[in-house]
Swiss-Prot record:
GO terms for cellular component: cytosol. One of its GO terms (molecular function) is DNA binding. It is found in: Cytoplasm. One of its GO terms (biological process) is regulation of gene expression. It comes from Escherichia coli (strain K12). Coiled coil: none annotated. This is Cold shock-like protein CspH. Keywords: Activator, Cytoplasm, DNA-binding, Transcription, Transcription regulation. CDD domains: CSP_CDS. Its main location: cytoplasm. It holds the Pfam family CSD.
Length: 70
């Protein structure tokens, strides 16, 4: 089950394509992979950007899916 949320990109490593998002509701940070972004948004991805995403339960804990810049 997914839940739509907003948050801020905490970290993002272009080499690995992985990072973390801090949810605006104060919950624990969630993992994000570059494949969760649209190609256009992935090009400008840097820490500090506000995003909208769906929080899903991944194999290694909370994960962000369907991520868009807001």
């Amino acid at each position: 089950m997914s839940r739509k949320m907003t948050g801020i990109v905490k970290t993002f490593d272009r080499k690995s394509g992985k990072g973390f998002i801090i949810p605006s509701d104060g919950r624990k940070e969630v993992q994000v992979h570059i494949s969760a972004f649209t190609p256009r948004d992935a090009e400008v991805l840097i820490p500090g950007l506000r995003v909208e995403f769906c929080r899903v339960n991944g194999l290694r804990g909370p994960t962000a899916a369907n991520v868009y810049l807001s």
